[in-house]
């Protein structure tokens, strides 16, 4: 039987909204990451202009990271009470304005306060954007789209590198932050093209019931925080000091180090997409455990290779596996979360994981004073990857769970 024109139009509209919601979530996270990485490229010139040390500039990055749970808490609550669209638009406009103001900062103190505020905006985007995207798409496509969404972080890093090469040599560091204000335009796209999710309409509740739901699911939330602490330790433990290993221990030039890093980011993007797709077929935990196990097996080649020809495939495959596991995170956390808490639980757990795992890089650096960088990274990365296998494998899973009315009462 042929479909009626009205039904066909509805299906076309639904598919368009799904694409737009995923695009909004992906672009929001990409541009949020871009705004964050802008500072990492211009630490030296900003420090020079404000007459402060690089340690003091690094403190502004730490300040941003420390405030991310605050943003996840605030915007997550708003997203569960008032819908996903408006809090996401508010958050994007907020961190875009703060980014522009950072480019206008007259001194270090003002700049530091602005980076604190930026951390609130950065912390709020992921959870709200992920819930909007995951609630808008068909369950059979959640995995691969989760991989796309999560790898917006790698895209943001690459985008910051491109903008740095084009903007900084001509207009300086302040112009970099002015470019960082452009994400505000994404809010217009969300306003015009993205609908509020049906799952939110069907799951929304009053504040009293909302508080009881949080209390009822506290064990699940603690598990999600443990999972995200482990996953952030794996990510930062295999990324942050690897360029330092390449430069200080392998004696590679900054250009060669940058080239290897960019190739590894391509691996990250590919891994996120492919393991996200694999999770649609074989399950979330199985996909993540597979990726983490292969990453564990890659450690010897990753830290002991000494030539560019050997390091490139090792770095590519390591980030392919690590970020492959990460590609499953948006869908896994959103499926685990009860509908009435989906704006709050994933984002707040994610950002608390960032906070609790923030010492992994420092521990690696301290350990490298007594060992080599290769030994330090190999030991710490191996440890957190090994811990990751049971944390992921023995945890709960809710692959393909229905969102909205169908999930009410799920414990």
Which residue ranges define each predicted feature?
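Cytoplasmic helix-loop-helix junction between adjacent transmembrane helices
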Residues: 114-151
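C-terminal transmembrane helical hairpin of 12-TM major facilitator-type secondary transporters
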Residues: 279-329
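Extracytoplasmic gate region of multi-pass secondary transporters
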Residues: 40, 219-269
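Conserved MFS/SLC helix-loop-helix module at the cytosolic interface between two early adjacent transmembrane helices
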Residues: 70-106, 282-285
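Cytosolic juxtamembrane N-terminal segment immediately preceding the first transmembrane helix
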Residues: 1-34
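Helix-loop-helix hairpin linking two adjacent transmembrane segments in secondary transporters
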Residues: 149-191
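Helix-breaking motifs and short loop linkers at transmembrane-helix boundaries and internal kinks
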Residues: 51, 83, 104-110, 138, ...
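Central cavity-lining transmembrane alpha-helices of secondary-active solute carriers
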Residues: 62-75, 262-274
């Amino acid at each position: 039987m042929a479909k009626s024109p009205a039904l066909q139009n509805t299906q076309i509209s639904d598919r368009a909204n799904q694409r737009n919601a995923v695009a909004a979530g992906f672009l929001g996270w990409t541009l949020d990451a871009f705004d964050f990485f802008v500072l990492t490229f211009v630490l030296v010139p900003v420090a020079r202009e404000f007459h402060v040390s690089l340690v003091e500039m690094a403190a502004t990055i730490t300040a941003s990271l420390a405030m991310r749970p605050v943003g996840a808490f605030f915007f997550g609550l708003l997203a569960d009470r008032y819908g996903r669209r408006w809090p996401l638009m508010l958050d994007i406009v907020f961190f875009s304005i703060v980014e522009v103001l950072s480019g206008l900062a007259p001194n270090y103190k003002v700049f530091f306060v602005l980076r604190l505020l930026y951390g609130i905006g950065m912390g709020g985007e992921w959870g709200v954007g992920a819930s909007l995207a995951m609630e808008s798409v068909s369950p059979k496509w959640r995995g691969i789209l989760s991989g796309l969404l999560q790898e917006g972080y790698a895209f943001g890093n690459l985008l910051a590198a491109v903008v740095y090469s084009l903007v900084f040599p001509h207009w300086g560091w302040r112009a970099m932050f002015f470019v960082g204000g452009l994400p505000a335009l994404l809010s217009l796209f969300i306003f015009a093209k993205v609908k509020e999710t049906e799952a939110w309409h069907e799951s929304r509740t009053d504040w009293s019931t909302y508080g009881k739901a949080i209390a009822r699911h506290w064990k699940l939330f603690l598990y999600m925080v443990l999972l995200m602490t482990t996953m952030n330790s794996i990510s930062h433990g295999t990324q942050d000091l690897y360029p330092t290993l390449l430069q200080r221990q392998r004696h590679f030039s900054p250009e060669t180090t940058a080239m290897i890093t960019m190739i590894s980011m391509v691996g990250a993007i590919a891994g996120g997409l492919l393991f996200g797709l694999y999770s649609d077929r074989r399950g979330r935990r199985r996909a993540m455990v597979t990726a983490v196990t292969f990453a564990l097996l890659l450690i010897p080649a990753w830290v002991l290779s000494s030539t560019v020809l050997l390091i490139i495939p090792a770095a590519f495959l390591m980030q392919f596996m690590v970020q492959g596991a990460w590609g499953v995170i948006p869908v896994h956390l959103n499926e685990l979360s009860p509908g009435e808490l989906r704006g709050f639980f994933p984002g707040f757990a994610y950002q608390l994981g960032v906070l609790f795992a923030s010492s992994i890089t420092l521990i690696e650096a301290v350990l490298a004073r007594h060992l080599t960088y290769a030994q330090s990274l190999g030991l710490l990365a191996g440890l957190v990857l090994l811990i990751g296998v049971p944390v992921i494998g023995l945890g709960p899973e809710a692959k393909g769970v229905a969102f909205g009315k169908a999930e009410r009462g799920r414990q």
